[in-house]
Amino acid sequence: MNTLTNKLKEKAKKLNKTIILPETEDERILRATEKIINEGIAKIALVGNEKEIKERAAKIGVSLEGAIFYNPDSCATIDAMSELLKKRREKKGMTFETAKAILMSDPRYFAAMLVHQGRVDGMVAGSSSPTAHVLRAAIHVIGPRQGLKTVSSSFVMITNTPEFGDNGTFVYSDGGVIPDPTAMQLADIAISAAEKARFTAGIKEPKVAFLSFSTKGSADGVSVSKVREAIEILKVRNVDFDFDGELQLDAAIVPEVAAAKAPNSKVAGQANVLIFPDLDSGNIGYKLTQRLAKAKALGPLIQGLARPVHDLSRGCSVEDIVEVVAITAVESEM
């Protein structure tokens, strides 16, 4: 087992958090629930009719002993929850009736509301729905955390090259949410990614590099200007981590290249958090690292929300779900 994921599971066990899984029609969710409960990683809440879910589980040989159930159809607080959702979306024209219909019909919204109310500690979804559906529920119900306007994502990349990053571990961001971030959004993404590095990846000293095809003025362009503006924004935001840019990838992570291209940088040559200028480069970058370097990729991990919600790939395995639940439990302490 990977050392980092093992550490996350052990940390989650000590926290005893409750994580809600709304997509109970997926048998992988049921199998993961059994495994998580048996291993003591977290308490699990499921959305739906308890009898029906347990019957589905029994058909595949799964016990849900110890699971908690929340059924929208019999929820005594559904009206209060609906009123709260209406208030959060009132400026967008949402009525009480519409809010209640959404909570009754979409388990992701219902689960997100339980997270927002603090009745559970976090949500994991996406095994049977697109990322956009999970994000929509999280943003509409929970919203960005104080001080941020941007909800984005990151990947924790665990490589076999300990000479780079933090003993081979990196955080890549954003590789899953914002197609063409503004300079302000890039600054938000950097703040969230640095937090992800500390709490999830175990990187004690995040060193954040804003990546580009240019290093310190070696070239110009619209995307380069955006990165430079993000750096200036971050300088006045009183952050507690080192950052620099614009840097080419080799200047960011290779000490010899950094010495030649950015000799006065506190980050160049030792970056462990990589901020990509757009979603194209971020998504391509993590997949290149995953496939060609045979790195383990944890994510996409949603960041910037007031309370933790994480998305699953629709191709996820049971073990993937277990790992993301552990991450969500740990991040509920952020």
Please provide the spans of the model-predicted regions.
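Anion-binding alpha/beta catalytic cores of soluble intermediary-metabolism enzymes, centered on
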Residues: M1-A268, V273-M334
